[in-house]
Amino acid sequence: MIHKKMICKVLGDLLLIETAMILLCTGVSLFYGENDLPAFLYTACITTGAGMILALFGRNAERQLTRRDGYLIVSLAWIIFSAFGMLPFYLSGYIPSITNAFFETMSGVSSTGATILEKVEDLPHGLLFWRSMTQWIGGLGIILFTIAVLPIFGINGVQVFAAEASGPTHDKVHPRIGITARWIWSIYTGVTLIATLLLAIGGMSWFDSVCHAFAATGTGGFSTRTASIAYYCSPYIEYVLSLFMFISGINFTLILLFVTGHFKKMFHDAELKFYFWCIVGFTLSISAILYLKTTLDAETAFRTSLFQVISIQTSTGFATNDYMTWPTMAWGMMPILMLMGACAGSTSGGMKCIRIVILVRVMKNEFKRLLHPNAVLPIRINKQVIAPTLQSTVLAFTFLILLICFACILILMGLEIPLTESIGVVISSIGNTGPGLGAFGPAFSWNALPDAAKWVCSLLMLLGRLELFTVLLLFTPDFWKRN
């Protein structure tokens, strides 16, 4: 049974929270005295009205949520948040197309960072701040924020969290989820503030520092500059952002363990070690290629490689260099990183490293099984046996993401987008990365995509952000059955 009133109440509260965020951006617009102020005021009125109507409809709701309600709330929340979040762009006239405005907002809320803007600097400060804030909110999840608020209304947030964190994670957060959510948001905010301070020390304006800190911790990648991080020509800024993108790619429950003094448990985590060594391996490989086959000196080759590898693997999408100008072997590694992603339970997109670890262990077991058909070969990660059901889920997820990628690549090719560009756009969208390949690489916007392709990409961003099953489950007949 789906609790419609409770769902309306939660979504209404979400819209009221979005209104508060829009009002913050209204303050920024007022401070700079720019012409986007009316758009924010209209948006605040519309969003408040819609939120109050939904909250009113759910005022006498039974205070409980099922897992089914959780999946529905998560999917609707991202769509509704994006639909209302696009209004400042659209009403201000800076993005006069509904398709483009929704694409830009979904790209932010899903922490993808792909943009249709040809010149980012044309946007006034209020819209730039809202654009940056969408990825910061989306990075950790609109729903996770709500979980920290839900206990105020006496609602158990476990079912909602189960839908948002549908991938395999380090540890399930159970009855004390409200407390844990507050801890995570405190850490998230603290990391953002430290990043802001360090970027400002490096010469960025305070406004740019805040916006880029939002982008780095949310692994979104929206910059306030068309040239992205290349605009600043600062090795210091590149190293600082590399550090914070790396941190944001770590499972936040592990960061919580670190903050609470459980260092040993954190550093022995199998997924974290895989994530770290992937970055080391790809960075050294690309550094060697750039050093040997281009005119870059050793330090520049290393810094460029490190920044782009972390940026792409964490699905942030910042750019200091157009990797499409690199030797083919070097830029050919980018789609692998896009699809792989960082750690589960982080703000990054992609398949997540833990799934890769499980797949590798399953593959190794199959070789052993060929030699020892009757052997019992459990898969252990962090000293815990991975249940066959979880192994099946990982295999199903892998098959599904490859199937969706293949189908959408064909769809984009049917829209007369070349093969290389289609592959890059699809993998970047479903991996929530941002830059793609070819004409949609880091040096270009996605404005040239046909409108139909932009809607396909928006759907892929949503699917990637919510781990596929959360959204696709809504289209199965069993989901809507009463029992």
Model segments located where?
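Membrane-proximal intracellular helices of multi-pass ion channels
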Residues: 1-483
